[in-house]
């Protein structure tokens, strides 16, 4: 995200605290992060798939249903989750953007050890089905599964919690 964050993460690897990283290939400091990762051959490098709250890798003309006029995804994960339930051309746009993010990481020469997703949207049923399809074309050998629940529910669920539950159920 930021050069200072990248430097701190690489310092963590250099001191033995961190063994792998997940990169957002469309983030503003992604190039320097990929260069730094490439200089550390033992570092596991994964793709942190961004389909919400960030900029797309592809130009807007290729994915008009996914991004606003500036090429940014919706900022709220719940809004993205509802959007990605739609079928038709939207699924193909998602697939194209996911493919573009994978290819951008692989074009650096880095070996992709895993995938994760911003706000865990890589686990959305539509996105996960696309990742399963692409696994035969790319070295997707591991997909991060969060240890805990994505949402925490209390006795009195808010309407946001109920909507979030409905998206993934």
Task: State where each predicted segment sits.
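Active-site mouth loops of central-metabolism enzymes
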Residues: 1-2, 83-95
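Active-site beta-loop-alpha junctions enriched in small/polar residues
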Residues: 24-28, 48-52, 118-120, 148-151
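Catalytic domains of cell-wall/extracellular-matrix polysaccharide-remodeling enzymes
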Residues: 90, 99-169
